[in-house]
Regions:
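N-terminal "arm"/small-domain region of PLP-dependent enzymes with the aminotransferase-like
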Residues: 31-109, 117
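Conserved PLP-enzyme active-site core in the AAT-like
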Residues: 32-41, 47-51, 60-66, 127-327
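Glycine-rich beta-alpha junction loops
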Residues: 65, 79-85, 235, 257, ...
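Conserved N-terminal alpha-helix of the aminotransferase class I/II PLP-enzyme fold
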Residues: 87-136, 161-169
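Acidic-histidine catalytic/liganding microenvironments
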Residues: 122, 324-328, 376
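A common structural junction motif
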Residues: 288-289, 376-386, 437-442
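Conserved C-terminal alpha-helix-loop-beta "cap" of PLP-dependent enzymes
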Residues: 332-418, 422, 430-432
Length: 442
């Protein structure tokens, strides 16, 4: 694809525009409702009509908790800490897990169940579980399966708190880690695997450098060496990339970013096979990092507009990246769907669009970056991303400040690096603000 050309979300190389971007087997209207679950199919019965696969836009809207006696059209908020038993026998059977049902909102709640069901469907997973935050989800995705003496191989380019988890916290419990560069060969990844290695952990694209990792290659390695592949899919959402298609066992999201899309609530989610999620459910039930029903209700509503928002995020980000790619005040511009990006071919292979993040390096280093941040007028200066509002962040002094200078250099975080989360404003207004901030900070 030529630099600057656009691809609509959902399009694939060689696929018609209306082809569902689902992975695994096609999902149908009947698949929205699972027998003996609280989910129902809110589409009129079509049992006498041909079954057809549903697109993610439809699944994100039509997957809902079963209607109550009031026959509400929109899922209500279930603000309750616990649920009433019909009788003593039901209480016993629920706690022994002989029957399914709600007991306590730390274990399950109709709102969290609906949100998780949607995320699992969008990622092509069997099951999932919601967490109080993205980092709680990252921690749980490994802590539930690792023990003292185990080893993790991770991509070197990681979010700052994830890096701290591997380097500062896990070693306290006897869990060691090794890092591999994102652009390393398959042989280099294989060489990092030890007899004690249990997990491969990556984020792609990486935060903040937008390095991509070949998920198909890692999926083969995980299968060959019987490892669990965990992928942080936060930057792309399941609308743009489905890691389980390439062999991932668990997919992790910080839901407070693009999933929410408006910077309102905290949340995280992990999806995967029913067997792995059962182990994770035991972990969360007895350690407590559960998502609140209110946050789940907000996030489930947010998923209804995710594909529409991601379309605008991506088209705006591509426009911003293209506009500034040759700018005289910048040393580089990184965006996966620019032909100049090192991993452009890989982006076309495993992502259906380039995402909503653009990275710039300003000439003038740290002081220039500070002046730029102080000069923006429209864009928000905050450490979040994935918002409808465009956001600028300086990773060196914020999200990755706990890394040493040498560690930052290793993953390409230089003093002049600015991460821009491109929002849904008119693209000309976003470009104007970046232009005037560059001029004023010169």
């Amino acid at each position: 694809m030529a630099r600057g050309s656009e691809m609509k979300i959902g399009e694939r190389q060689g696929a018609p525009d209306d082809t569902p971007i689902f992975i695994s087997s096609p999902l149908t209207l009947a698949d929205i409702a699972v027998p003996s679950s609280p989910f129902e199919n809110r589409v009129p019965d079509q049992s006498d009509r041909p079954r057809r696969p549903l697109h993610p836009e439809t699944l994100a809207i039509r997957t809902q908790t079963a209607r109550g006696a009031e026959r509400e059209h929109s899922t209500p908020l279930f603000l309750t800490s616990s649920f009433v038993f019909d009788d003593a026998e039901q209480a016993r059977a629920l706690f022994t897990e002989e029957i399914a049902g709600n007991i306590y909102s730390r274990y399950s709640n109709p709102n969290t169940d609906e949100f998780v069901r949607k995320m699992a469907l969008l990622e092509g997973a069997e099951d999932g579980i919601a967490f109080a935050s993205g980092m709680a989800a990252v921690f749980g995705s490994m802590a539930a399966y690792l023990k003292s003496g185990d080893h993790v191989v991770a991509s070197r380019a990681l979010f700052g708190s994830t890096h701290q988890l591997f380097t500062k916290l896990f070693p306290r419990w006897g869990i060691s880690s090794s890092y591999v560069d994102a652009d390393a060969s398959a042989d280099a990844w294989a060489a990092a695997v030890l007899p004690t290695t249990k997990v491969l952990f990556v984020e792609t694209p990486s935060n903040p450098g937008l390095a991509l990792i070949d998920l198909e290659m890692l999926g083969r390695l995980a299968a060959d060496r019987r490892l669990m592949l965990v992928v942080d899919n936060c930057f792309t959402t399941p609308i743009l990339q489905q890691p389980m298609k390439w062999g991932a066992h668990l997919v992790v999201h910080s839901a407070m970013k693009f999933i929410d899309g408006q910077g309102r609530v905290l949340g995280g989610v992990v999806v995967g096979s029913a067997e792995l999620i059962a182990e994770l459910r035991f972990f969360i039930r007895h350690t407590g990092p559960a998502m609140s029903p209110f946050n789940a209700w907000v996030l489930s509503k947010s998923l209804e507009t995710l594909s529409v928002r991601m379309d605008r995020h991506c088209s705006n980000a591509l426009a911003v990246a293209t506009h500034f790619e040759q700018h005289a005040e910048l040393d580089f511009v990184r965006y996966p769907y620019l032909a100049s990006h090192r991993d452009h071919a890989l982006a076309l292979k495993q992502m259906s669009a380039g995402g909503g993040i653009v990275v710039l390096e300003l000439k003038g280093g740290l002081e220039r970056a500070r002046r730029f941040l102080d000069a923006v007028e429209l864009l928000s200066h905050t450490p979040n991303l994935g918002d409808v509002r465009s956001i600028v962040t300086h990773p060196t002094s914020t999200t990755h400040s706990k890394l040493s200078e040498a560690e930052r250099v290793q993953v390409g975080i230089v003093p002049g690096l600015i991460r821009i989360s491109v929002g849904l404003e008119h693209r000309s207004d976003i470009i104007w603000d970046i232009e005037q901030a560059l001029a004023r900070s010169a």
